[in-house]
Amino acid sequence: MAPHQFKSKGAPTLVHVREAARFDRDGLIPAVVQDVLDGTVLMVAWMNREALERTLETGESWFWSRSRQELWHKGATSGHRQKIKALRYDCDSDVLLLTVEQQGDIACHLGERSCFHRDEAGDYDLPPADTLSQVFRVVEERKAHPHPDSYTSRLLEAGSNKILKKIGEEATEVVMAAKDGERVAEEVADLWYHTLVLLAHADVDILDVYRALQQRRR
């Protein structure tokens, strides 16, 4: 079977991966899996050489189960497959990094987006992603659990007209800042923040926006 062409700019060639990957004495190498949309770490699994070859050939994640002592195709049963967008190795060539498009936004067998959904205290807490995603999750938290001292909570409770008015005001301030050449970053941050509030109010996930942006790259 011909190798699947998933290589993106900056990723190593398939030949380099095959030659560079350093397997341990058990013939395994750890593979960290991250979401292409926002960089969230989804899971860590193990590959042997055959799992790596199948991943390269099919463009989907294959791993080696140490407990069952067999290959497994991620998502073959659940439907939560991982389409490889890029594959890299670290400076010592003994860890792989798979950047994937996660089908169904679920990587964990417990039904969570990430296997790392517990913090050091055992509380539910998804791992950090990019800054916009983190801010959006805070906005969602304010929506789910309003706080009287929170500007975000008050804005959400005020409704769409208030939110839309603020977005219009912030957009105007971005234009004025760009003309003056001052405070552009701060004003854009304000505009983005209020846009995130609108997304939460409209029950639109930021990952859907990222998917739309991915389409703009083509």
Swiss-Prot record:
UniProt keywords, alphabetically: Amino-acid biosynthesis, ATP-binding, Cytoplasm, Histidine biosynthesis, Hydrolase, Multifunctional enzyme, Nucleotide-binding
Biological or metabolic pathway of the protein = Amino-acid biosynthesis; L-histidine biosynthesis; L-histidine from 5-phospho-alpha-D-ribose 1-diphosphate: step 2/9; Amino-acid biosynthesis; L-histidine biosynthesis; L-histidine from 5-phospho-alpha-D-ribose 1-diphosphate: step 3/9
Protein name (record): Histidine biosynthesis bifunctional protein HisIE
Show the segment(s) annotated as Phosphoribosyl-ATP pyrophosphohydrolase: 132-218
The entry's family comment says: In the N-terminal section; belongs to the PRA-CH family. In the C-terminal section; belongs to the PRA-PH family.
Q: Which GO terms describe its biological process?
A: L-histidine biosynthetic process
Query: Gene behind this chain?
Result: hisI
Superkingdom to which the source organism belongs:
Bacteria
